[in-house]
C-alpha cells in the first residue's frame, strides 16, 4: 500500500507532468502559461487592445499568453536581464529592472508605441497591466527565498507604479512568508482590490502564490 506522503508525491508529479506535456502540445514555452490563463480567466485584467508589461519575461510563456489576450492591436513589452528571443509579437527590452537605464528604455518604447512620429513627451502612465512571474532560483532556505521574492516584488511594483494607468492591474508572484502581510498592506494603499491566489497549475507543495491587484488608485 502507498503511504500518504507517497500518494501526495505521486499526485504532485502527475499534475506537473500534465501541465508540462500540455504546454508542449499548446506550443507554450513553459507550464507557467496556464497559471496566467487561470488568473486572467478569473480576474480579467488583460483584455483586447491592452498594453501589457511582462517583468522578467524569460522563458516567455506569460508573454505568449498576454499577446494572445491583447490581440493584434494590443502591445506586450517583455523585460528581462536574460537575452532570450522573445515570443512572436512581443517587444523585448533587455536589462535589470532596478537599473534606471532600463526604465528609460521602457519609457522610450512606450513613447514610440503611442507617438511614433513625434519627439513630444507623453504621460508615462499608459499601461493597462504589469505582470510578473519572476522568482529567484530556490536556495532551499525558506527565509532567504521569501526575502528574495519580496525584493523582486518590490522591483516589479516600482515598474507598475511608474507606468500603470489609473485602474490598471498588477500581478506578481511571491514566495509565501512572514512579510506577506506588510507587502499586501502596501499594495492595498495603491490598489482598490488586492487578493492572493494560488493557481491550480502551481505545484501543491510549492510556497509560491500571486498577488492580484486591480484598479490602481489615481
UniProtKB/Swiss-Prot annotation:
Catalytic residue positions: 173 (proton acceptor)
Main subcellular location: mitochondrion
InterPro entries tied to this protein: RNA_methyltr_RlmE (IPR050082), RNA_MeTrfase_FtsJ_dom (IPR002877), rRNA-MeTfrase_E (IPR015507), SAM-dependent_MTases_sf (IPR029063)
Residues binding S-adenosyl-L-methionine, per UniProt: 59-62, 80, 96-97, 133
Pfam families in alphabetical order: FtsJ (PF01728)
GO terms under cellular component: mitochondrion
Molecular function in Gene Ontology: rRNA (uridine-2'-O-)-methyltransferase activity
Gene3D superfamilies attached to this UniProt entry: Vaccinia Virus protein VP39
Annotated function: S-adenosyl-L-methionine-dependent 2'-O-ribose methyltransferase that catalyzes the formation of the 2'-O-methyluridine corresponding to position 2791 in S.cerevisiae 21S mitochondrial large subunit ribosomal RNA (mtLSU rRNA), a universally conserved modification in the peptidyl transferase domain of the mtLSU rRNA.
Family, as annotated: Belongs to the class I-like SAM-binding methyltransferase superfamily. RNA methyltransferase RlmE family.
Protein name: rRNA methyltransferase 2, mitochondrial
Name of the gene encoding the protein in the UniProt record: mrm2
Amino acid at each position: 500500500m502507498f503511504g500518504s506522503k507517497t500518494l501526495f508525491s505521486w499526485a504532485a508529479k502527475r499534475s506537473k507532468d500534465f501541465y508540462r506535456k500540455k504546454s508542449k502540445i499548446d506550443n507554450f514555452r513553459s507550464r507557467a502559461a496556464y497559471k496566467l490563463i487561470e488568473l486572467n480567466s478569473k480576474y480579467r485584467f488583460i483584455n483586447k487592445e491592452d498594453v501589457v508589461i511582462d517583468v522578467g519575461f524569460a522563458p516567455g510563456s506569460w508573454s505568449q499568453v498576454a499577446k494572445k489576450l491583447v490581440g493584434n492591436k494590443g502591445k506586450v513589452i517583455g523585460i528581462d536581464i536574460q537575452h532570450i528571443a522573445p515570443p512572436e509579437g512581443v517587444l523585448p527590452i533587455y536589462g535589470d529592472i532596478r537599473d534606471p537605464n532600463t526604465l528609460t528604455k521602457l519609457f522610450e518604447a512606450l513613447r514610440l508605441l503611442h507617438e511614433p512620429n513625434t519627439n513630444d513627451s507623453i504621460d508615462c502612465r499608459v499601461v493597462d497591466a504589469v505582470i510578473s512571474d519572476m522568482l529567484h532560483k530556490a536556495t532551499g532556505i525558506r527565509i532567504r527565498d521569501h526575502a528574495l521574492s519580496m525584493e523582486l516584488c518590490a522591483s516589479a511594483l516600482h515598474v507598475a507604479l511608474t507606468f500603470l494607468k489609473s485602474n490598471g492591474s498588477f500581478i506578481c508572484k511571491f514566495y509565501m512568508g512572514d512579510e506577506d502581510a506588510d507587502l499586501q498592506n502596501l499594495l492595498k494603499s495603491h490598489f482598490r482590490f488586492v487578493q492572493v491566489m494560488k493557481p491550480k497549475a502551481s505545484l501543491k507543495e510549492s510556497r509560491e502564490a500571486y498577488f492580484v491587484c486591480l484598479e490602481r488608485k489615481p
